[in-house]
Amino acid sequence: MAGAQRRDQLIGVARSAFAEKGFDGTSVEDIAARAEVSKPVVYEHFGGKEGLYAVVVDREVQTLHTAIREALMTPHAGSRRLIELGTMALLDYIESCPEGFRILTRDRTGGETGGSYGSILADIVTRVQDLLGAVFLHRGLDPKAAPLYAQALTGMVSMTGQWWLDNPQLSKQEVATHLVNLAWNGMHNLGKEFHLSDEAGHLADPERDL
């Protein structure tokens, strides 16, 4: 097997092992055995488990980051369409790369690999914040709240994606529909004045209760 092919084989084998057993539970021996090679072959290509793990994480980061960035930069798309596209980009990745998503969501190295799931979410939050800031100004809402809402929307989709990975009873389309329904209708119906219940539990606007 040529060097590049062997490298790709080891990356694929390692991705499955890391997704199944985690970083700490996976050894070079495990990876070599799965790939049917000797341990020195793994060390030759990656220098050890840490180097191989870094390559696996970096590949997944780039794949997911590119998909979501392209979705959120779709030209001439309105706010609702961008919510749909961003949501579907994440769910598409989870569906097609479940092993990669498992690795990213429990990545132990943080910034050491040149990127992580957290860095992807931070970039998404920034992009959503910019979009919401313009929308809030147009609707007469306080633009200073845009960062909070960007965090909330991004977290909602991200956490639901992690839940869906382990609870696939709903289809991807159903999950996306529910997420966009909640996100869009919640944002679309934001009021300029909203108050929490008082200490006695009385609602400021009971007519809007469920």
Language-model features and meaning:
Residues 20-24, 75, 97, 139:
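Short coil/turn segments at alpha/beta junctions that flank glycine-rich nucleotide-binding fingerprints
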Residues 1-5, 76, 143, 191-210:
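N-terminal intrinsically disordered/low-complexity leader segments
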Residues 26, 30, 53-60, 67, ...:
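Alpha-helical DNA-contacting segments of helix-turn-helix folds
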Residues 62-66, 85, 113-137, 147-152, ...:
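Amphipathic alpha-helical packing segments from all-alpha helical-bundle domains
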Residues 9, 13, 17-51, 55:
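Helix-turn-helix
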Residues 55, 70-96:
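Hydrophobic alpha-helical connector segments
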Residues 93-115, 129-133, 159-166, 195-196:
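Amphipathic alpha-helical segments used for helix-helix packing
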Residues 6-14, 31, 56-68, 128:
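Generic hydrophobic, amphipathic alpha-helix propensity
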